[in-house]
């Protein structure tokens, strides 16, 4: 969540920044709710101070004391309601976008930063026509937007995840196999709830949710903790689940947009003064992984209005898909500044014993979409970098 104390001290700056992502109204509602709470707080303090009487009270004083208690109970109830309203409003305000985040409200407003590699024509076939991908049986077993990845194509995917994890471990990341069912607090702390709750699967009997990214458990694992050492670098492999409730009619063929997919994720905890350098380093790792597979791509700076609730800035890397004749997103890399850590109650010891809020970042190191890009760009030939991890030379 945003720092409400900082917002009180400089509301105009916060409002102007949040307006870039269409959240000025949400900020106004927060400030109004906070103003009411702050107005009621001293009233409660004053009424509590008036509850004591000196010496033996007269009947008139007892009657006055009874009236004060009734008034105190009423104002305390108002204060509790105001605090709940303020906290609910605070939960809905997204992170403040960084000044360098691109202007605009949609994915079409993203600003291209660079391109790498030659965007070739391919052989005209989509990935589902090249690899062993069975969407029909996936639909029979699980419904639409599910599929089986089989045989050599499955080996390519396994090799891809091994390739990414091997690189990240060599870069100093700690490998993690996280849980994929989490409590609501974990989804709230990472900023996915309440704004995107409809996008995630709920196991209602156990009050658990299937994660859409291992970013969630990698942040929640330090929830309500004080960290003694920064930075922390984690990488995780997990299955991910998304309802894709807003994707009706989009990418209905193949595995590009599905309800279940695999992903290798990076998560970093660091100090505020180091987080922007860390953001660039994570982007460089993503680029290096794609370059190692000789996949053409472009990097874009996401528009402020298209950022996730938690992100202050995000880079997307879009790989070239020749059968679609366009670049499509295969990674994202976000700096969430102190937003997730503040929501999750995570702090660290800064300069001795003082406590501060760390910055957290996340980025994609590999997903099933990379396998699709490999199939389309090379017509079934598999990069040597993956053959070293068990992939066949061709599928």
Describe the predicted segments one by one.
Residues 114-395:
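TRNA-recognition modules of translation machinery and tRNA-sensing kinases, especially anticodon-binding
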Residues 1-119, 132:
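N-terminal alpha-helical targeting/anchoring segments
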């Amino acid at each position: 969540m945003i720092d409400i104390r900082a917002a009180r001290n400089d509301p105009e700056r916060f409002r102007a920044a949040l307006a870039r992502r269409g959240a000025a109204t949400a900020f106004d509602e927060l400030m109004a709710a906070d103003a009411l709470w702050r107005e009621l707080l001293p009233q409660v303090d004053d009424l509590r101070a008036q509850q004591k009487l000196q010496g033996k009270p007269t009947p008139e004083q007892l009657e006055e004391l009874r009236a004060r208690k009734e008034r105190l109970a009423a104002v305390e109830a108002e204060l509790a309601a105001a605090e709940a309203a303020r906290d609910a409003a605070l939960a809905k305000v997204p992170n403040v976008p960084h000044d360098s985040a691109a202007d605009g409200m949609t994915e079409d407003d993203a600003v291209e930063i660079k391109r790498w590699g030659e965007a070739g024509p391919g052989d005209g076939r989509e990935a589902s026509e090249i690899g062993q991908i069975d969407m029909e049986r996936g639909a029979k077993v699980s419904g639409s937007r599910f599929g089986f990845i089989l045989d050599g194509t499955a080996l390519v995917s396994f090799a891809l995840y091994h390739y990414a994890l091997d690189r990240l471990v060599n870069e100093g990341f700690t490998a993690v196999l996280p849980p994929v069912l989490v409590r609501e607090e974990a989804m709230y702390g990472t900023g996915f709830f309440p704004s995107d709750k409809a996008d995630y699967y709920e196991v209602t009997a156990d009050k658990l949710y299937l994660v859409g990214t291992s970013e969630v458990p990698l942040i929640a694992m330090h929830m309500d903790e004080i960290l003694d050492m920064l930075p922390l670098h984690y990488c995780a492999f997990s299955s991910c689940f998304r309802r894709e409730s807003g994707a009706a009619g989009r990418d209905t063929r193949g595995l590009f947009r599905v309800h279940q997919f695999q992903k290798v994720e990076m998560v970093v905890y660091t100090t505020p003064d180091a987080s922007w350098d860390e953001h660039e380093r994570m982007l460089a790792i993503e680029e290096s992984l794609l370059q190692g597979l000789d996949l053409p791509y472009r990097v874009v700076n996401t528009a402020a209005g298209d950022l996730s609730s938690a992100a202050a800035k995000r880079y997307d890397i879009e790989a070239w898909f020749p059968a679609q004749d366009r670049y499509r997103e295969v990674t994202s890399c976000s700096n969430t500044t102190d937003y997730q850590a503040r929501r999750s109650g995570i702090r660290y010891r800064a300069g001795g014993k003082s406590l501060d809020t760390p910055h957290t970042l996340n980025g994609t190191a590999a997903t099933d979409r990379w396998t699709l890009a490999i199939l389309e760009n090379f017509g079934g030939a598999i990069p040597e970098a993956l053959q070293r991890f068990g992939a066949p030379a061709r599928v």
